[in-house]
Every structure is written in structure tokens, then in C-alpha cells.
Amino acid sequence: TAGYEDEPSHTVTTVIVPHNAKSGQLVNYLAYIDSNGAQCAPSYSMRQGSKFLNDDLLNYQQLLFSTFLNEGWILTIPDYQGPQRAFAAGRLEGRMSLDGIRAALNFGEIGLEKNTSVVTYGYSGGAIASGWTAALQASYAPEINAIGFAMGGTPANVTSTVQSLDKGVFSGLCVAGITGIIYAYQVVQDWFQNHLYPKGNDAIEYARSHCITDIFSRYPFSHVFSDDFFRNGSSILYDPTIQSVISDIVLGLKESETPKAPVYMFHSQHDEIVPFSDARKTSHNWAKHGADVFFQEFSDLPIGHALSEITNIPNSLFFVRDRFAGKPFPKGYTRKVTGNGLEEPNASLAGLGELVRAIQDIQGREVGPADSELKQFILDRN
């Protein structure tokens, strides 16, 4: 694959072929890694035989992962952060994702044809990769038969995302995001060498060797953008050197980076981790530039960032099913507001009862209203 400046690079993608595999259908599954430790990448955590992503906080990803496999879809699961473990470096992640698809299509033992239909899915940090896969596919990998892109809880603007997280219970994501950008861009790495205080340097080093649960638990309610961590910490995001990089990884700004295949986006209006307004703005920009976008909003107050994906698993499943079935997709821009994903009539279809019960179990036992159980889990570990 290639780095941000077109330098040669490399990464790994893990391909899973279910026993009931359907030929000609590939799902590019972009797990939310949201961290910088090498052991957090899917190829490492899955090879170790651990629970998916080897992280207690993220284990419920297995539910959607298993649902896709049960459909008979072959999955390619790339380590899209690359050897730099560059979390939040969207353009880099998009390239790694697309080259992972190429690798799967070119690996003869899997038996996929070059014109295999591909649908991409990603949530949260995985939606950064999914969004940039959609944005870059037409220019970077036009030969891929991309027929749909799904993404939810999308951090479309890294700057506003980390600003909203600073000093909150999930402020560890600020540390992980900064660390990813530092190691993706040499110019940023050079700049930070002169701006890191000991506490900031310790945080970067910690993030480089840990997964997201540990990072969350070590840095809740931290004022990351402060002089405790960095010289002129409150203004580093506005420094010209940093601005030149982060302003170039805002999804939806360039008309030339408009997805050519249908886009399904979903987001809670009350998302406490990723700003809702940024994702909606990206959806509008893409539609304005000619993309077909279906944007689904969840209005229920208890539906926070984690519950958005969990309760929307049936709709994500239907989107992928419909793309492979060649069903029509609404043209232009479509907005739909529901309380949560399980309110959709199709969620109660025959055959989905067990899935819905599993979702409701996780919703109440592991996540809680407004992600309250997740927040308490982080604080209990601190």
C-alpha cells in the first residue's frame, strides 16, 4: 500500500470465509480500533484467539461481525491504521482499506473474481476509515466494484471531535487521536518534538502500547489541550503546521472526493463522543456534490454513541443485503428520524428475533441508557 505522501508502505488484512460463503460478495469490515497499540489491530487480536479486538469495551462488535458471517458474506478486515498505527489519519486509513480489498480480490485461494461486489461498513473509528474509503475509492481504486458504503457515529471532523472530548470521561480518545496523527505525518511528529511536556510525552508513549479501554481508564476527565501536556496546549490545533494537516482530513469538503456508490449514514442526535452536526454536514456536502445519501438520525435520549450501533444492527444488515440484491436506493439526499434502530418495522422480521434479543441483552447489561454502563466501567478501572 502507500503512505500519505505516496511512499511505499504495507499492512495486513484478515480474510474470513464462512462455510456458507456466497460467491461474488465481499464485505470490507472496518473494526473500530480507536487506539495505537500494535496488539489492538484485528490481525493481532484475532490471531491470539482472543475476543474480537482483545478489548472488553469493544466485544459487542462480535455481534455484527457474526451476523455478517451468518449471511454467508466473505469478510476482509484490514489493519487500516497501518504500521504507524495511525488512528484518526483518515486519508491513510482509506488507502489501507482499499488496498486491503485489492489484496483480497487478488488472492487466488479465496476464489473472488476481480468484479466481485464490495460493500464497506465501519462505525465510530471504523467510520473514519469507511468514510475515507468512500471518498477515495473513485480516484485511488476505481477498478473496485464498490456498490455501497455504510458508516455510523462518523467522526467527520477530527478537530471538533477531539475538542468535544477534551476534559470529559472519554478524553483518552484525544490522546489516541493525537498520537495517531503524530505518527502518520512526519511534519507533525517533528513539530511535536518541540512542544511535548513530560506529561504529554508519557501520554503519547502510553497510547502507543495500549488499547482503547486502558487509554480510556488512564485519562478520563483529562485536559489534554493544556499546558500540562503540551507547550501552548490550548492553541495547538490552530497552529499553522497542525492546521495544514487536520484541515485536510475533514470528510466531504472536496467535490472530487464524492462517493460514487450509495451511502448509508446513521448517527444519534445525542451522541456524547462524536459530534452529530459534523456527520450531518458531511452527508449534506456529499449529496450536494452528487452522491446518493440516506442519513438516519436517532432521537431517543438514551441512545448514545455505543447504543447507536448496537440497536441499528438490523438496519445495517438490511443495507448490505439490499446492495448485494441490487435493490433500488433513494436518489439524492434522504433524511429519516427514528427513536432508535430497533423501531424500524423490519427489525421484527422472522429470523431476526434471536438477533434482536441479543441486542436488547447487550443494551441493558453492558451499555446502559446513554452509555451509562460503559462510562461506569471506565471509571471503575481508573
Curated annotation (Swiss-Prot):
Q: Which residues are glycosylated?
A: 115, 157, 232, 346
Q: What induces it?
A: Constitutively expressed regardless of pH conditions or exposure time.
Please name every pair of cysteines joined by a disulfide bond in this record: 40-211
Cited PANTHER family: LIPASE 5, PTHR34853
Q: Which residues does the entry assign to the active site, renumbered to this chain?
A: 124 (nucleophile), 271, 305
One Gene Ontology term of the molecular function aspect = triacylglycerol lipase activity
Pfam families attached to this UniProt entry: LIP
State the similarity comment.
Belongs to the AB hydrolase superfamily. Lipase family. Class Lip subfamily.
Enzyme Commission number(s) of this protein: 3.1.1.-, 3.1.1.3
Enzyme class at the top of the EC tree: hydrolase
Key words, A-Z = Disulfide bond, Glycoprotein, Hydrolase, Lipid degradation, Lipid metabolism, Secreted, Virulence
What exactly does this protein do?
Secreted lipase that hydrolyzes acylglycerol lipids such as triacylglycerols and consequently releases free fatty acid. Can hydrolyze 4-nitrophenyl palmitate to release 4-nitrophenol and palmitoic acid. Due to an absence of fatty acid synthase genes in Malassezia species, secretory lipases are essential for the yeast to generate free fatty acids from degradation of sebum and assimilate them as lipid sources for growth. Plays important roles not only in lipid metabolism but also in the immune response of host cells and pathogenesis.
A Gene Ontology cellular-component term:
extracellular region
Q: What is this protein called?
A: Secreted triacylglycerol lipase LIP5
Superkingdom per UniProt: Eukaryota
Catalysed transformations (reactions): a triacylglycerol + H2O = a diacylglycerol + a fatty acid + H(+); a monoacylglycerol + H2O = glycerol + a fatty acid + H(+); a diacylglycerol + H2O = a monoacylglycerol + a fatty acid + H(+)
List the subcellular locations: Secreted
UniProt record, GO biological process: lipid catabolic process
- Predominant localisation class: secreted
